[in-house]
Amino acid sequence: MTTKLARFAQKRWISSTTSTSNMYDPRVFRDPVTNVQELRKPLDSDDERNFLFLKAMKSDATPVFYRDHVIDKLIRVCTKDGEKETSRKNVLSALEIIKRRQYKAWAKASEEEKKSIELDPFLVAKKGIKNCHPLMKLQGVTRGGTTYQVPFPIEEPEAEFRAMKMMRDICRVRSKHGETHFKDILATELLAASQNEGSTIQAKQELHKTCEANRAYAHYRA
């Protein structure tokens, strides 16, 4: 039985050493090129991509000008009850509001002030989210029947997710209380965060203060 399985794996280009959840054999598949400039360059004669297969490109890696990894992730984080299209409309509407507000401020500014005003809403949003990245997180650790909130360092992808989640929760609470629409609150929060201001920045600072207060429990990490 084992011999037959090995022969089948060799015929079908399936690796018998890698995880079964990996559909691409690393011996014969390579990552796709998603950069437009790289795609236009000819391959060298000895480039292995001339002889091997390429993996299917992920849907969020499409090399088009209106797609952005951070914005796509924000759309997914803001999705509620599977209504991704509604989330997309809210996020893109927030970016449009940012564009209008920034252009209005730019039109009224002096020539010197115009240089410091960013008109690209994607850059404003990404800067705001970046400023909200927490450096630490609190995680429950049980010792002797007692659970302690222990501060842990945080990796960049999780920091980005937590920044988006904090901003999303703040916007949802404020919109639920009838202050204004979600898209308007999100635009305001992104603009404020790009200047290191706003409720999300305050939430991040409060988290850091709590982590600092709980640093005595840091030895529970091990």
Curated annotation (Swiss-Prot):
InterPro entries: Ribosomal_uS7 (IPR000235), Ribosomal_uS7_dom (IPR023798), Ribosomal_uS7_dom_sf (IPR036823). Keywords: Mitochondrion, Ribonucleoprotein, Ribosomal protein, Transit peptide. The keyword Mitochondrion applies. CDD domains: uS7_Mitochondria_Mammalian. GO terms for biological process: mitochondrial translation; ribosomal small subunit assembly; translation. It holds the Pfam family Ribosomal_S7. It is found in: Mitochondrion. GO terms for cellular component: mitochondrial small ribosomal subunit; ribosome. Residues 1-14 form a transit peptide. It comes from the Eukaryota. Belongs to the universal ribosomal protein uS7 family. PANTHER family: RIBOSOMAL PROTEIN S7. Component of the mitochondrial ribosome small subunit (28S) which comprises a 12S rRNA and about 30 distinct proteins. This is Small ribosomal subunit protein uS7m. It comes from Caenorhabditis elegans.
